[in-house]
Amino acid sequence: MLASIHALLNKRDSRAATLWLGAIWSLPLLGPMLYLALGVNRIRRRAISLGVRQTVVRPIPRDLGETQTSAVENLEMLARVVSRVIKQPLTPDNHLDPLVNGDEAFPAMLAAIDSAKKSISLLSYIFDNDASGKQFADALARAVKRGVQVRVLIDAAGTRYSWPPITHRLKHEKVPVAKFLPASLFTPWRVTTVNLRNHRKVLVIDGQTAFTGGMNIRQGNVLADKPKSPVRDLHFRIEGPVVAQLQEAFASDWAFTTGEVLDGDLWFPELPDRGHTVARIITDGPDADFETVRWTLLAALAEAQNSVQILTPYFFPGNSLVTALNLAALRGVRVDIILPANSNLRFVDWASRSMWWQVLERGCRIWLTPPPFDHSKLMIVDGHWVLLGSANWDARSLRLNFELNLEAYGRNFAERMGKIIEEKLRGAHEMTLAEADARGYPTKLRDAIARLFSPFL
């Protein structure tokens, strides 16, 4: 009864509430236990996490000012909406470089770790104990021996993708490492957090250079090595004032996990101007009052005048975003959604395909990229605004996971990202409404059943 009441009062998605009520009442013992483990998706950060130093950056004034108005251009209202949703300032004068696949990202990240003189912060969802993971572990160990202050945070579930977990190797090398929200049979009091994962990817070197995006640390990202399960992905090297916001996000997660507050010039030095891109970090998670990524996406779609390009590995965004996509298309905005023809999760593919017709019939375009599986996440609006980071267009990223994205304003950077999109579209197949409707009835039924579980995927 208590589980049913909790589901009715706390589930914002009516489908999720209905499914959980069905499970609770049809499985009298197992149902409530499953709900306790997987259905409770809110946690409260310990007060210590609030003690993390506020970001030391130069916010754009409320009127944006003449210089920054030219950078934000006709997307000033989008900037204001996001400011109200996340209460984090935009920062000017940043420089961002894309790093394609582990072939480009890993050497750059390893070189940065080897160059560190004061501090290293590393947060990853998956950190495998494979060839690539061992390279990172060894580089971190070398940094510790040089006297660099190192902190490594890995999602507890993400450590289980390889055995033995990389944490064993890191601890043996005296690298300070912690697991985010660990849970096991021996810690039943943590069962309510087992479904809440930290999907963020952050590396900050000396508080001045950062890396973020969608890439985990695993060998499959290095395509030149011809791995068994290759994965294409996108990461970014970042310099400028916005690096302090990335460091603050890491410091908050580290304080929440370990109780240690990272502060002072060692972690938050003064940051020089490095470029011409206006940027801001957007953090999201089940402890936040607002679903900040969802609100950002809705605001961006409402502001779009000419074009929207979405690159995501998983796509079942929910009714509100489907409506926003369709409204943009009906206003004459060209909406392109680029997905992998087959992801690494078959059941998720089925759920996604069951709702393609909803956006195709209103004029959105869906493009399917050939193998290898593309795990990249990117959104471009009007060739001027870019959203990059860890979040996918699915219920897990938009409601359950701790995510970290970055929004960037500037035509030069958006043009560079547009070329990456163009390259992916060259070999892609455009899915039509007729094609989607031509699926056989057994396939449609299978996909529709899978979609019922989309709130949990």
Question: Which residues make up each language-model segment?
Answer:
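Helical hairpin unit composed of two closely spaced alpha helices linked by a short loop
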Residues: A304, Y314-D336, P340-A341, L345
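Histidine/acidic-residue-rich catalytic or RNA/ligand-binding cores of hydrolases
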Residues: N319-V322, D349-S352, V381-H384, R399-N401
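CN hydrolase (nitrilase-like) catalytic-core segments centered on the catalytic cysteine
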Residues: A351, L360-R365
